[in-house]
Amino acid sequence: MGLEEQLPGGILLSTVEKVAGYVRKNSLWPATFGLACCAIEMMATAGPRFDIARFGMERFSATPRQADLMIVAGRVSQKMAPVLRQIYDQMAEPKWVLAMGVCASSGGMFNNYAIVQGVDHVVPVDIYLPGCPPRPEMLLHAILKLHEKIQQMPLGINRERAIAEAEEAALLARPTIEMRGLLR
């Protein structure tokens, strides 16, 4: 006989983290950060056919101070990397990053000195979305996966510790331009 059976009807038991996660996942405001071809598919996702507003993303925010999700859509050049980091630092907590497309995830076909070989070398990434370019349906699926991740995310000091560990791992990772393998 649990506590739920002893309580009168109409009482809901939950934790603060679950309630906060539910509210956060349904009110994301993405920042506009389209860098290449993937940005076209990201814009199509906001159109009437796919209607990203169904998932709480009523509008794309033009200022990082009002955004809590950065969708990096496309390749990131070495000159754009500091700007990307500055925009990420200006976003208020809690914030999440989605790497959209192969170029944002791993540099894509641009394996040279001018392109960052994965945006995770600049900012911590929460969700990687493969494809060249990924379809709007795939972006919606990635957003739903991010919703699941947000709902399970801890609050307070536990979240700060998780963010610090992710950023430390990103900074210590060896750049893929320096890796040697079958193609180099």
Curated annotation (Swiss-Prot):
Q: Which reaction does it catalyse?
A: a quinone + NADH + 5 H(+)(in) = a quinol + NAD(+) + 4 H(+)(out)
Q: Which residues bind [4Fe-4S] cluster?
A: 37-38, 103, 132
GO BP, sorted A to Z: aerobic respiration; electron transport coupled proton transport
UniProt enzyme class = translocase
Q: Name one GO molecular function term.
A: quinone binding
Q: Where is the signal peptide?
A: none
Q: Answer yes or no on keyword Transport.
A: yes
Required cofactor names: [4Fe-4S] cluster
Q: This protein's superkingdom? A: Bacteria
Question: How is the cofactor bound, in the record's words?
Answer: Binds 1 [4Fe-4S] cluster.
* Alphabetically ordered keywords of this record: 4Fe-4S, Cell membrane, Iron, Iron-sulfur, Membrane, Metal-binding, NAD, Quinone, Translocase, Transport
Kindly state the subunit structure of this protein.
NDH-1 is composed of 14 different subunits. Subunits NuoB, C, D, E, F, and G constitute the peripheral sector of the complex.
- NCBIfam families in the record, alphabetically? nuoB_fam, PRK06411.1
- UniProt family annotation: Belongs to the complex I 20 kDa subunit family.
Q: What does this protein do?
A: NDH-1 shuttles electrons from NADH, via FMN and iron-sulfur (Fe-S) centers, to quinones in the respiratory chain. The immediate electron acceptor for the enzyme in this species is believed to be a menaquinone. Couples the redox reaction to proton translocation (for every two electrons transferred, four hydrogen ions are translocated across the cytoplasmic membrane), and thus conserves the redox energy in a proton gradient.
Matching entries from PANTHER family are given as:
NADH DEHYDROGENASE, NADH DEHYDROGENASE [UBIQUINONE] IRON-SULFUR PROTEIN 7, MITOCHONDRIAL
Name by which UniProt lists this protein: NADH-quinone oxidoreductase subunit B
Chain's gene name:
nuoB
